[in-house]
């Protein structure tokens, strides 16, 4: 069973749920990953909110996550300001401007991120945030990786928030807490789901 409707799961139960979804992601075919990447990028770039955005916070995709590397390249080619998260202890992150991937350095999680010297971008200066997850549901809530970085950060900004997910990684419902913030939309390769927050 890949969705859990009840609230207030323990840390162990959430960890088990993440494991189930990550195993599902690991089993996706290369063909499907390539095709869905193209569809997700197409739908993301079709959003009026994205087209109008001047400053966009992306995340650096790893493993079988939807490909943000091509998104970042295209955004830079369009003249947008692109940013990536810089992580700090205690679940704190900041948006820092990037001009290319050669500027990045491995974080303590081994995920490339901007150097401390990269220009910081205030949360209120962001127009659009591409939000990661282990899984999104059809109500705009996410099962994150468990560190709480985005839970804290999204509470600081008024930017338009957009989750990206493969259709096969959409859950009917993920567990949620009172502090969880729903994204404004979720983009898959096949559809764009929107909510009024």
What are these regions (language model features)?
Residues 119, 142-143:
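Short capping loops/turns at secondary-structure boundaries
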Residues 58-60, 131-132, 188:
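Redox-cofactor binding/interface segments in oxidoreductases and associated redox assembly factors
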Residues 112, 132-134:
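A structured binding-face within diverse protein domains that lines the active/interaction site
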Residues 8-125:
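N-terminal active-site beta-alpha-beta segment that forms phosphate/nucleotide-binding
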Residues 62-64, 134-138:
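Short glycine-rich anion-binding loops that position phosphate/pyrophosphate groups of nucleotides
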Residues 4-16, 23-30, 124-129, 137-141, ...:
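Surface-exposed, charge/polar-rich loops and edge strands
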């Amino acid at each position: 069973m890949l969705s859990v409707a009840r609230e207030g799961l323990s840390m162990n139960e959430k960890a088990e749920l993440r494991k189930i979804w990550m195993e599902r992601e690991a089993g996706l075919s290369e063909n499907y990953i390539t095709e869905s990447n193209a569809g997700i990028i197409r739908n993301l770039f079709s959003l009026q909110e994205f087209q109008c955005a001047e400053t966009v916070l992306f995340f650096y995709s790893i493993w079988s996550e939807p490909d943000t590397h091509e998104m970042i390249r295209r955004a830079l080619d369009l003249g947008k300001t692109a940013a990536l998260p810089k992580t700090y202890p205690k679940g704190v992150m900041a948006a820092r401007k990037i001009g290319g991937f050669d500027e990045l350095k491995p974080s303590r999680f081994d995920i490339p991120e901007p150097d401390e010297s990269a220009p910081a971008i205030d949360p209120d200066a962001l127009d659009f945030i591409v939000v990661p997850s282990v899984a999104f549901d059809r109500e705009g809530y996410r099962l994150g990786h468990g560190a709480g970085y985005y839970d804290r950060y999204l509470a600081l900004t008024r930017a338009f928030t957009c989750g990206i997910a493969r259709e096969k990684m959409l859950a009917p419902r993920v567990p949620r807490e009172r502090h969880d913030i729903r994204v404004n939309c979720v983009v898959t390769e096949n559809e764009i789901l929107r909510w009024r927050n």
